[in-house]
Amino acid sequence: MQLITDYQNEFVAFMQEHLKERDPKNLYDPIHYILNVGGKRLRPTLTMLSADIFGTDYHKALYAALAVEIFHNFSLVHDDIMDAAPLRRGHPTVHTKWNLNTGILSGDTMLILAYQYFEQYEPNIFQELAKIFSKTAIEVCEGQQYDVDFEQQAQVSTDQYLKMIAYKTAVLVGAALQMGAIIAQTSEENKQKIYDFGLALGIAYQLQDDYLDTFGDASFGKKIGGDILQNKKTLLYLKALEKGTPEQKQELLTLYSTEPKSEEEKITRVTELFIATESHTFLRAQVETYTLKAFAILDTLDIPEEKKNILKEFGGSLMNRTI
């Protein structure tokens, strides 16, 4: 088995090899740009790792891994347009660096390019990959729409929020793993279980992201409090509203509906309310619940223990990160 960094390095080299300069430059340059401004390469790594774990040369999974990464970045380009976000990974967003129309067109092209990379596989594997990819792409769009809808909703339940992050984030983690299993042509049971593992892990991953946005370690360079400043209805916020006193609830609603005199003061006070209502404790418990659920599914996979342990270590490293 390869080290995770080995998969990542091989993937980046493969991606660079296949990102050819093409015309019109104002369509393709933004694609190259967004794919080269960093990112953890989590999803393509999982596709390669899954193929390896199920007994196939992981190099066979590189085209699917590239499709997954391009699709993920397509979703970010369009998310940034909808959020009017000026920065992504510390760099100007595509629509900011170019323009809105170019951002839309480049994103659309990325979605189509992702499908084209599946054409490298034989027909039966291509059909399976395209099926899970289409299902996942629709779910990601549904998740994004839920997120947009929640901005206008006065009330959002915990279950609604969990469904939104499952669709917007976790289904692609599950699909990335399942694609590796499809390429390895493992059993149908293994394909479903590795997807379910990824779905649970993806939910835990996003919940951990929500937690770190407020309670992460600023010394690592991560900007703390971005979700608070954007008035995002994360699980921290929703649970604080649910568990807080009438006074705490009203203060939180006011903080999220008025322009702050000081951004730092807003972050500090909202964080204090999260702690006072113990919503941060609830969120940490949810991260642990979904991580343990993922590992319980992993235990039922029909693969050797040492391969299960690789996935457990990788999952554990995601949940224990500080940035």
Model-found features: residue ranges?
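All-alpha prenyltransferase/terpene-synthase fold signal
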Residues: 1-323
